[in-house]
């Protein structure tokens, strides 16, 4: 179960961008892939197509990373953290497991 949401500040815990931080932009493949702003940037070679008005060249593009390779970033501890759920005032909220602070304020 993926406990991330769009707009969460995450840190990459595995892969070529390990240690870098970014914000979750979207999810793909039912939540198993996460598109993170500024992470997993690759260069794509685009073929020109004058009929569509596409100019050819090399374009940098963000690709999604597996959700298991990112963790939510806890600003209080400055480290990656895990997320749990609990009820506060009959409302389900997320909290950081290391210090118990709420993620959703």
UniProtKB/Swiss-Prot annotation:
The keyword Translocase does not apply. GO terms for biological process: translation. It holds the Pfam family KOW. One of its GO terms (cellular component) is ribonucleoprotein complex. Disulfide bonds: none annotated. One of its GO terms (molecular function) is structural constituent of ribosome. Keywords: Ribonucleoprotein, Ribosomal protein, RNA-binding, rRNA-binding. The keyword tRNA-binding does not apply. InterPro entries: KOW, Rib_uL2_dom2, Ribosomal_uL24, Ribosomal_uL24_CS, Ribosomal_uL24_KOW, Translation_prot_SH3-like_sf. One of two assembly initiator proteins, it binds directly to the 5'-end of the 23S rRNA, where it nucleates assembly of the 50S subunit. Part of the 50S ribosomal subunit. Belongs to the universal ribosomal protein uL24 family. This is Large ribosomal subunit protein uL24. The gene is rplX.
